[in-house]
């Protein structure tokens, strides 16, 4: 293997707020690496410094060249979305993450807040936005960089948690998911994975 991927660039709200204050501008540690963003609990409708953080992601992107964004759920607080035409798609996502460097592939999964709305609409947005790529509630994809192979496995964690399955009025789709089917799929993917790096991503 020609390279070892020594770092993953993980962006969370806490991390980035600290990062903004430090105003680090030397991104050389990310040179010649397979960089991607991991972002969780994104959807704040523009509040809680969401827009400045999105701008920072774009500015950093100019230097480090992220391959994609791994969006690990709750792109839509607090009640999810109602449809692919819900205005929240604009105010939580499109108008916020509008920097040219963020016009890359986004690979999302569902969070518990999406489960309070129309979860199918989150999947169907794949047909609306070129950069929104969500083929299923859980899925896997492989990447290769200079001889190193990486497998990322996206899992749907909300139905795995009893609390959400029991609160049917608040999370109506959670109890409808086949938990055993997902776990069997996950076990099979992990058992057959041959890549150098294996990353499992979930909201919880």
Task: Identify what each model region corresponds to.
Residues 1-9:
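Bacterial N-terminal signal peptides that target proteins for export
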Residues 9-18:
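Bacterial N-terminal signal peptides
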Residues 20-87, 175-176, 180:
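N-terminal active-site segment of His-dependent metallophosphoesterases
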Residues 28, 35, 77-198:
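Extended active-site neighborhood of metal-dependent phosphoesterases/phosphodiesterases
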Residues 41, 73-74, 111-112, 155, ...:
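Active-site glycine-centered loops adjacent to acidic/histidine catalytic or metal-binding residues
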Residues 69, 196-202:
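Generic beta-sheet signal
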């Amino acid at each position: 293997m020609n390279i070892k991927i020594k770092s993953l660039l993980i962006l969370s709200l806490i991390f980035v707020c600290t990062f903004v204050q430090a105003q680090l501008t030397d991104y050389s540690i990310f040179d010649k690496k397979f960089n991607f963003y991991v972002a969780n609990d994104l959807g704040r409708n523009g509040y809680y410094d969401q827009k400045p953080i999105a701008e920072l992601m774009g500015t950093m992107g100019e230097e480090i060249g992220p391959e994609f964004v791994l969006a690990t759920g709750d792109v839509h607080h607090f009640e999810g979305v109602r449809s692919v035409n819900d205005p929240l798609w604009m105010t939580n996502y499109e108008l916020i993450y509008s920097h040219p460097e963020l016009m890359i592939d986004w690979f999302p999964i569902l969070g518990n807040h999406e489960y309070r709305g129309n979860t199918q609409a989150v999947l169907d947005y794949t047909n609306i936005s070129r950069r929104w790529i969500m083929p299923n509630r859980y899925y896997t994809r492989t990447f290769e960089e200079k001889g190193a192979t990486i497998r990322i496995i996206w899992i749907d964690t909300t139905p795995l948690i009893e609390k959400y399955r029991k609160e049917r009025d608040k999370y109506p789709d959670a109890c409808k998911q086949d938990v055993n089917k997902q776990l069997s799929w996950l076990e099979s993917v992990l058992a057959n994975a041959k890549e150098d790096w294996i990353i499992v991503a979930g909201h919880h």
